[in-house]
């Protein structure tokens, strides 16, 4: 990290601490004492329990924020995990991937497909990058998300189009933002650590009268990635929300969020295929090339990644009575995912010259701004009809998304010269890459393609109390999903892009600009669940749910400027959405005076209707008959076993299979990519002394196949990430009732493991051991 950047972050940390104390000075909150004896500041998450302490010192169990959840979690016949702010803070998380490590069964895909160099979670083996929401509204565009403004993260698993509309079928993730409260408080954190780690945050909540409040969150951070040469980051963010009518029947919340993140992008290390293709010697069974963990193939003089986000939200809620509440949320957001990154798997096969393996650096590039305008209306409440109780929600969702995509040319004019017979520049030894190699050249951006997507969704939910012990949970949703794209036919020579004038002008009237036809899909999805309650705090359930994935997002990532048409004999046909269904049975219980929540479920997920080559011909014949299946068991635990002992985690077993693949596919019968058979996590803390808490996390993931089917990554040549076990350590010491120190040691054993691989180009090594020390002040 540069000295100037380190100096600026140190100044930010000092300013954060000073500003936080100044903001807090006139508005100290009275301390309240929770039932477990832990000193707590009103409305703040506490290290010793996973609920929220209200102004009366009572623990409120974490629950999803959306009115679509018409029943408490214990009575919801679905696998739903709520990761509260306490876990986010205690684990030292600063990314969505850090948070979701605590929810087994979720993996992250490598940088390929529709969301390269962006969050690409896989839930129950299904790519779910398009199924990330913020406060119930889909968060579009490629991003690597921050956590400083999060109150909790909510994960629903299984086919969930009833909740989310179009989706991948594996589940969805909702990020719940911090919101204004009527209790004054300020939280300030300042952290330092190994690998030039610096991070500072301020969370200030200021009541403005009896029913209004302003909440401001600030974040600045920088550092290097442990164990990865030259990989660093620098980011800052601000979130501000203003609320009026708090504690009354009518509330308005207006909020703004901004994030600016700059980093050196990392595409990991090559696979064995770099040294001669699929038939090359394979020294390691995984297929990952045995190079140093810190081997970095990018160029500091050329590569970069910038993410920016701006989001404006207006939320109005009015409660007419217990039977009727109306909520309307509008949002306008823009995101930009902009990068040039070296892909060690591109650039052709390496060559052995003079006893040294040499390779050319290939590049991946993207300029991807996205814009979203959304409005969601919910009408919800509780009513009784004929002695039967209903908890219902009716909703309307309207969205318009504009997604543009372009790439960069990176024509090198000088730099690291290639030895003969390789020619040109951008060469490096495979086993000794130097990110400080010089580079100069021409960088130009191509004309962008564009897609405009408009959706309308109508939905209804009802939790029906048939008796004191039996509940029926129903949901239905209709969606209209339509999109139209514009593509640009262009070529680049020596770094200069030229629109191809030979393409006839289309209705756009511009040569080379091709307006693709508007495509529209309508689909209806359902869920139904029956719940039996042996006690007030436990339940047994069985449920069924469906999901639909239009062909333009069949990869589970983002909308594309495509046609939605098939291949070969289906070239003139508009493909139908892929269909997913989930059957699930389970049990839930709140134990120990509702301090601890546990859940156990078993499920079968089936995804059908993917386009496949069924006869190689000639002529080649395609049909929508592809099918995958995932069967699994999940165990979850969250809360306090004793007032001093906190646990959060679970175990997932997934038995996945490609049931039907392409003609003569060698992958049929194999487990799916990014779907490890076993995964488990447990983060636990214990208050060993009145002011000292110790703990840590253990994370296990079994072998996970690479992210692509077929080719070098499929069949007998399957690339995979080997199993690993990672251990984190945690300690916290209360200096005073309002000040504490927190020590996090991530990957304490310095385990060398592969987080993920796309199975064709590269594999991503996990960061090495990293330690951080954070001072937390709460007023």
Model regions: which residues?
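Acidic/polar loop-and-plug regions of large Gram-negative outer-membrane beta-barrel proteins
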Residues: 221-226, 233, 238-317, 336-370, ...
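Face-selective signature of the C-terminal outer-membrane beta-barrel domain
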Residues: 312-333, 363-490
């Amino acid at each position: 990290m540069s000295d100037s950047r380190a100096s600026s972050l140190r100044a930010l940390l000092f300013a954060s601490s000073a500003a936080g104390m100044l903001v807090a000075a006139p508005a100290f909150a009275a301390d309240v004492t929770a039932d477990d004896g832990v000193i707590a500041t009103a409305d703040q998450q506490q290290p010793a329990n996973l609920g929220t302490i209200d102004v009366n010192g009572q623990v409120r169990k974490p629950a999803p924020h959306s009115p679509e959840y018409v029943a408490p979690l214990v009575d919801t016949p679905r696998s739903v995990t709520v990761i509260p702010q306490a876990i986010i803070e205690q684990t030292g998380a600063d990314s969505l991937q850090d948070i979701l490590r605590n929810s087994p069964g979720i993996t992250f895909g490598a940088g390929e497909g529709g969301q390269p160099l962006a969050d690409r979670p896989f839930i129950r083996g299904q790519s779910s990058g398009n199924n990330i929401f913020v406060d119930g509204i889909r968060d579009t565009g490629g991003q690597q998300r921050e956590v400083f403004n999060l109150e909790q993260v909510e994960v629903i698993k299984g086919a969930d189009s009833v909740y989310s509309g179009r989706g991948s079928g594996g589940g969805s993730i909702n990020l719940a933002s911090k919101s204004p409260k009527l209790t004054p408080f300020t939280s300030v954190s300042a952290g330092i650590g190994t690998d030039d780690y610096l991070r500072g945050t301020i969370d200030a909540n200021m009541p403005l009268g009896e029913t209004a409040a302003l909440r401001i969150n600030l974040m600045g951070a920088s550092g290097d990635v442990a164990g990865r040469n030259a990989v660093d980051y620098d980011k800052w963010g601000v979130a501000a929300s203003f609320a009026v009518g708090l504690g009354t029947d009518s509330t308005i919340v207006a909020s703004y969020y901004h994030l600016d993140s700059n980093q050196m992008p990392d595409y990991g290390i090559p696979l064995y295929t770099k040294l001669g293709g699929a038939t090359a010697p394979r020294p390691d069974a995984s297929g990952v090339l045995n190079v140093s963990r810190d081997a970095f193939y990018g160029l500091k003089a050329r590569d970069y990644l910038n993410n920016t986000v701006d989001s404006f939200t207006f939320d109005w809620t009015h409660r007419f009575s217990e039977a009727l509440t109306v909520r309307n949320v509008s949002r306008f957001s823009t995101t930009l995912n902009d990068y040039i990154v070296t892909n060690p798997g591109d650039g052709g096969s390496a060559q052995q010259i003079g006893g040294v393996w040499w390779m050319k650096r290939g590049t991946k590039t993207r300029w991807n701004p996205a814009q979203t305008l959304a409005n969601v209306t919910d009408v919800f409440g509780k009513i009784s009809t004929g002695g039967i109780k209903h908890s219902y929600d009716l909703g309307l969702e309207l969205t318009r998304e504009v997604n543009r995509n372009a790439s960069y040319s990176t024509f090198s004019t000088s730099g690291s010269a290639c030895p003969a017979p390789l020619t040109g520049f951008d060469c490096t030894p495979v086993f000794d890459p130097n990110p400080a190699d010089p580079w100069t050249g021409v960088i130009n951006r191509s004309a962008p393609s564009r897609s405009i997507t408009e959706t309308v969704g109508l939905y209804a939910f009802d939790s029906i109390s048939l008796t004191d012990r039996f509940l029926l949970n129903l949901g239905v949703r209709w969606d209209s999903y339509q999109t139209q794209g514009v593509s640009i036919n262009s070529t680049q020579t020596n770094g200069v892009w030229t629109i191809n004038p030979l393409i006839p002008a289309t209705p756009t009237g511009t040569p080379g600009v091709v307006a693709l036809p508007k495509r529209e899909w309508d689909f209806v999805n359902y869920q139904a669940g029956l719940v039996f309650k042996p006690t007030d705090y436990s339940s047994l359930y069985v449920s069924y749910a469906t999901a639909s994935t239009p062909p333009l997002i069949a990869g589970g990532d983002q909308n594309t400027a495509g046609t939605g048409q098939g291949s070969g004999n289906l070239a003139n046909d508009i493909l139908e959405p892929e269909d997913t269904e989930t059957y699930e049975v389970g049990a839930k219980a709140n134990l120990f005076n509702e301090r601890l929540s546990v859940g156990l479920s078993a499920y079968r997920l089936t995804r059908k209707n993917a386009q496949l080559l069924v006869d190689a011909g000639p002529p080649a014949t395609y049909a929508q008959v592809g099918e995958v299946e995932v069967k699994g068991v999940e165990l979850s635990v969250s809360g306090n076993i004793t007032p001093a002992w906190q646990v959060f985690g679970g175990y997932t077993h997934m038995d996945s299979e490609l049931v039907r693949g392409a003609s003569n596919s060698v992958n049929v019968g194999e487990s799916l990519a990014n779907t490890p058979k076993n995964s488990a996590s447990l983060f636990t803390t214990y208050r060993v002394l009145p002011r000292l808490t110790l703990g840590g996390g253990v994370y296990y993931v079994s072998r996970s196949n690479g992210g692509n089917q077929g080719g070098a990554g499929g069949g007998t040549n399957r690339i995979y990430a080997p199993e690993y076990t990672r251990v984190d350590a945690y300690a916290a010491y209360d200096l005073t009732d309002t000040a504490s120190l927190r020590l996090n040691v991530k990957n304490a054993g310095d385990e060398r493991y592969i987080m993920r691989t796309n199975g064709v180009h590269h594999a991503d090594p996990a960061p090495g051991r990293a330690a951080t020390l954070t001072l937390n002040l709460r007023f």
